[in-house]
Amino acid sequence: MKKQLLLLIVLACAFVTSVKAEFQLERPKLVVGIVVDQMRWDYLYRYYNQFGEGGLKRLINDGYNFENMHYNYVPTVTAAGHASVFSGTTPAFHGIAGNNYYLNGKKVYCCGDTTVQTVGSKSKAGQMSPRNMMVTNMCDQLRLATDFRSRVIGVSIKDRAAILPAGHSANGAFWFDKSAGCFITSTYYMQDLPQWLKDFNKKNKKDLNQDIAPLPIGVTLTTRIAIAALDGEQLGKNPTGDTDMLTVSYSSTDYVGHSFGTRGEKTDEIYLTLDRELKVLFDALDQRVGRGNYLLFLTADHAGCHNAKFMNDHKMPGGVWKQSAKKKELNALYAQKYGITNIISDFFQNQVLLNRAAIEAKNLDFCAVRREIAAKLAEDSLLMYAVPFEEVGSSSLPPAIRDRVIMGYCPGRSGDIQVITRSGYMDYSYEQGTTHVAWNPYDTHVPFILMGWHVNHGFTNRPVAINDIAPTVCAMLKIQMPTGCTGNAIYGD
């Protein structure tokens, strides 16, 4: 009887212990979010046999790979992409409708903020903040969950690629000032550069004293500043035990893509450099934070189209469709018809912004004129569709396109008419380089790989969307998703 009683006590203790273990909250020491500007998904395999063992191959072979990750909106541009990755939503909700967009009829830069000043140089390159983003992101949610004990830092060559990922409540975001040859920030975050960044700028002065953006050294310096931030801010070594976060965006890949396209020696060079630099970063994380102690993901803010001439040379469809030429043509037409000099104020990101004030000053019905201009645009043989934004939901657009237009439309910040070009047609140089803005897979299909803390190796080909990344990371951290989140957790379900 005593033995049976003892056995019951032991079993009861074991049960209580197991229950306690189930409810123990665990989080990694550090989260690292990496964005590679303009990285197409297929680059993972185009260069696979040329990659070393510790960079992108490590991600592919150790991480969990979402092979069918797409952007689910247009326009597919840098600012919108970075905002979407970290906020778990799209321009319709986060408000970053483009790199530049219109607010109350005035053209604004996505991160422009004249209420703050540059810290680290005498230029205006630091008059930036995340204030135009209308929602929180995963970094903000981490800060909220830990009563702001978590430390969040964002770094990139591009200001928007450092600022938008780091969120509203970041401890710091740092970007490159080409005119001064150093990394800077703004008074939104602090009044003086941290000592580690002053030391970094001084140590790397020779390399920084050039336009690093389109060069392999730009990739190298991005890695260097990421590691400098890791050390300087002691990320992953929070004295409170809370999770820290580092966001790193590699911009040089985008500059090379725009200049040289998706193929060629320069593109090869930049991605092989990226691979080597990722190994350097991963090794630093292993040494400083500990392998298995950090959660890391890699994705892209958009992809990129093959150059039109390259496609034509290989007997495939593609070409150039110039927004500026179409704007000039339509303005001339409607100046004659309605006596309005510039009925189209701007043509950007495949969107038409009409001169509402001029139209209404002529006592014309704005909606009727907008519909008329959309119909005129639709006559262009290089366009598939031209639809007023407010009529997209009831239009004949195929659902795959219609839904992307709706998710990318932000009232008051987007244009009046959305145009959809034929596949492979873009507003760019025919001979060389490329761009991105479209709904097509060449602009929307990007990598998304998780690696590290509590991540098992594997892959899936099921369709997932860019706004699923933030809720996935938040679910893994057991924190609330961002305030405008429209995606779902996709790992561990």
Give names to the regions the model predicted.
Residues 325-364, 435-477, 491:
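Substrate-binding rim/cap in mid-to-C-terminal beta-strand-loop elements of soluble/periplasmic
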Residues 1-26:
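Bacterial Sec-dependent N-terminal signal peptides
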Residues 44-93, 151-153:
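Short, structured active-site-proximal loop/turn typified by the sulfatase FGly-forming signature C/S-X-P-X-R
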Residues 90, 95-242, 251-258, 378-381, ...:
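His/Asp/Glu-rich, glycine-adjacent segments
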Residues 51, 68, 77, 99-127, ...:
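Secreted, luminal/periplasmic, and some membrane-associated catalytic domains
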Residues 28-40, 59, 85, 142, ...:
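Beta-strand elements within well-structured catalytic alpha/beta cores of enzymes
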Residues 66-86, 154-162, 249, 295, ...:
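Short, solvent-exposed turn/loop segments enriched in Gly/Ser/Thr/Pro and often Arg
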Residues 22-64, 485:
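Active-site-proximal N-terminal segment of extracellular/periplasmic enzymes that hydrolyze or transfer
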